[in-house]
Regions:
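Glycine-rich phosphate-binding loops of nucleotide-dependent enzymes
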Residues: 2-235
Length: 235
């Protein structure tokens, strides 16, 4: 089976800083694939590059068999690839419902069944649908960012640090929701500093250090890796 997303030997720069150095990985349909590593390892830069916010100096990025390496973000979204960015980035002065509707912008309409689906996954958002998004808690804003991404029925969802800044209880809830999305057939590329949580729900993972992939394997294999335990799991 051909990979849904295929990243091959990409090199990405911030000015003269070589942030991503020859990274290659694949995401197959129905998988959760995680990128783990310390701050500054290049994880978020890779997501920005895949979503078109940055462009690689060299290398290829294929999504559903099409080259998207130098495509603009608005074009990439129409292909079925959405990015839930680090820091949630909700429209603070718009209502919860208006934020959710924005997720369907590329469809040109707001499908009622999609609204019902996200409210069934995130009942707390339904209760707060008329509330300004900026007044939600951090966990609720993360749920809203995820709900907004789901509105366009994407083929691949990329999530950048979904547990950042959340309480342990909310972290559990967010990872439970991500696992449920995978069970319902979603394909997810996850960037997460909480390696323990990420590896427990992921099918495959890649470890990044200073812009390079240094390890890869199944979630279980990396959880049991002594190198990963020492570096990321407190072992």
């Amino acid at each position: 089976m051909a990979a849904m997303l295929k990243v091959h030997d990409i090199h990405v720069y911030y000015g003269k800083i070589h942030a991503v150095k020859g990274v290659s990985f694949e995401v197959n349909e129905g998988e959760i694939v995680s990128l783990i590593g310390a701050n500054g390892a290049g994880k978020s830069t890779i997501l920005k590059t895949v979503s078109g916010l940055m462009h690689p100096k060299s290398g290829t990025i294929e999504f559903m068999g099409k080259d998207i390496a130098h495509m603009e973000p608005n074009k990439i979204v129409t292909k079925g690839l959405v990015h839930v960015p680090e820091g949630r980035r909700v429209f603070a002065h718009m209502s919860v419902m208006e934020n959710i509707e924005m997720g369907a912008y590329i469809l040109g309409r707001v499908p009622e069944e999609a609204v019902e689906d996200v409210f069934s996954r995130f009942p707390r958002l339904k209760e707060r649908s008329r509330q300004e998004a900026g007044t939600l808690s951090g966990g609720e804003q993360q749920m809203l960012a995820m709900a907004r991404a789901l509105m366009s029925k994407p083929k691949l969802i990329m999530m950048d640090e979904p547990s950042m800044g959340l309480s342990p209880i909310l972290v559990e809830q967010i990872f439970s929701i991500i696992a449920e999305l995978r069970q319902s057939g979603a394909t997810i590329l996850l960037v997460e500093q909480n390696a323990n949580k990420a590896l427990k729900i992921t099918d495959r993972a890649y470890v990044l250090e200073t812009g390079r992939i240094t390890l890869s394997g199944s979630g279980r294999e990396l959880l049991e890796s002594e190198d990963v335990k020492k570096a990321y799991l407190g072992g």
